[in-house]
Amino acid sequence: IPPSAKPGVYKGKVVVSAESGFPVSVPVILEVAPESLPAPAHWQVHLDLWQHPQAVARWHDVEPWSPEHFALMKPVMKRLADAGQKAITCSLIDEAWNAQTYDWFPPMIEWVKGKNGTMRWNYANFDKWVSFMMNEVGVKGQISCYTMIPWNMKIRYLDEATGKYKFLDLKPNDPSYEAIWGPFLTDFRKHVKSKGWLGKTCIGLDERPDAMVRAAKNVLDKYAPEFK
């Protein structure tokens, strides 16, 4: 019922028909109350249904993050926005959930170890996705980034020296954990701040032991305290 509908009692009928048989007319009485809901963007319920953009690309056999991919995602994601969706699901690393879904969940941020041994990060797909969800779909409340504690406790990166993908082992409460995440969080914080997204960015932690969560939070508070 559109917000412009006047309160009152409306009467009509619904005609049900099929390929065989006679149409059936059903009387309908509808009472419209004087209250109306605000636009979904202003609803207070924090709706956070996770999105999997890669699944849309796979189903339609299009190049991920291409114009065709975004065109196919728009009506799907718009339904979420119309339901009051507040959060954008983002992947910091490759397979944060260790391949528990049918479709591969790739990173939106590429980790690359340069020939000089320094790690750098490519945010191109992350920026495309967040900008699309905010500006074209209308989901603007929160950027949920998964995760600092993946289920397989590994981070995939591209080693420029060999041209091959390799993995970093994550050990919360070990100095190596901070050595891995500290530089990333420093760079990532700087990046989202430059985009105007700092106050909306959150680090998602999913079904992880308390000791791991506390270790991750200690590192997070040290390098990017604005992140929720």
Predicted regions, residues:
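Short, surface-exposed loop/turn segments at beta-strand-coil junctions that are enriched for proline
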Residues: 2-7
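Aromatic-lined carbohydrate-binding surfaces of glycoside hydrolases
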Residues: 10-18, 24-227
